């Protein structure tokens, strides 16, 4: 798994990778406001998107999963790069406004723990952006063979994971509507993106989903659990 970092570096320096980064950056920017004083973190591999998400940020954390290996990024001195355990993020409670997850979610073995950690780290109105390979997309095989992704996702699976872990999906987008192994197609990528986004989401290579932290849902669930435990205890005492 540690060779993933090198695979990503090689990919994003290639002509295909540069086309992909331009397309994905545009998709991110359509849903990523550049408000000042935001506390932002990116987990995974996102060197091609640092300038986009780091703009005007109050603080920025670049979190690289330990299994990806080590890689040095030149960031502003008030920012932090760290190799992390995705299930135990070195981030204080309620200390992030945005979390971008790219080249990370598809390598996790336990998405529930990761999403609960993300929920903990995000502020009450925090948002999470997740970019993952699509199970039915043209890039599914490329992600598995070249990036060694452990799995791909359908939009139903993503929605279920987010909702069950106290996030509310607020926008869904699709991208990469051209096959990755054909030079002719990726040279016409802008055309395929325009047509594909209108008519062929089923064949999109990646899903981009944005969700908001559902703070009240988690509090309500906790109260219900406590209430049920109290009720059971009362019944036992009565017996």
Model-derived segments and spans:
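Conserved catalytic loop of SAM-dependent methyltransferase domains
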Residues: 170-204
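C-terminal lobe and adjacent flexible extensions of AdoMet/dcAdoMet transferase-like proteins
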Residues: 193-239
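A short acidic, Gly/Pro-enriched loop at the edge of an enzyme's catalytic core
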Residues: 87-99
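A short glycine-rich, Lys/Arg-flanked "PGG" loop and its adjoining helix->strand segment in the class I
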Residues: 112-127
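Class I SAM-dependent methyltransferase Rossmann-like catalytic core
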Residues: 1-34
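Conserved class I S-adenosyl-L-methionine
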Residues: 127-152, 156
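Short alpha-helix
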Residues: 148-176
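Class I SAM-dependent methyltransferase SAM/SAH-binding core
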Residues: 26, 34-88
């Amino acid at each position: 798994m540690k060779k993933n970092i090198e695979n990503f570096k090689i990919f994003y320096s290639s002509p295909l990778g540069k086309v992909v980064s331009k397309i994905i950056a545009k998709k991110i920017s359509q849903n990523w406001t550049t408000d000042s004083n935001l506390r932002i973190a990116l987990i995974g591999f996102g060197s091609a998107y640092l300038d986009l998400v780091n703009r005007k940020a109050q603080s920025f954390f670049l979190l690289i999963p330990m299994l990806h290996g080590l890689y040095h990024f030149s960031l502003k001195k008030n920012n932090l790069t760290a190799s992390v355990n995705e299930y135990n993020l070195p981030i204080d409670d309620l200390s992030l406004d945005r979390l971008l997850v790219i080249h990370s979610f598809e390598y996790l073995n336990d998405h529930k723990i990761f999403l609960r950690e993300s929920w903990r780290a995000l502020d009450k109105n925090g948002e999470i952006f997740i970019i993952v390979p699509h199970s039915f997309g043209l890039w599914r095989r490329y992600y598995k063979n070249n990036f060694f992704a452990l799995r791909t996702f359908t939009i139903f699976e993503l929605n279920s994971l987010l909702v069950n872990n106290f996030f509310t999906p607020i926008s869904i987008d699709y991208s990469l509507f051209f096959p990755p192994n054909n030079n002719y197609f990726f040279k016409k990528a802008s055309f395929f993106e325009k047509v594909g986004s209108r008519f062929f989401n089923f064949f999109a290579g990646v899903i981009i989903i944005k969700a908001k932290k559902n703070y009240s849902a988690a509090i309500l669930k906790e109260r219900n659990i406590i209430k049920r435990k109290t009720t059971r205890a009362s019944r036992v005492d009565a017996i």
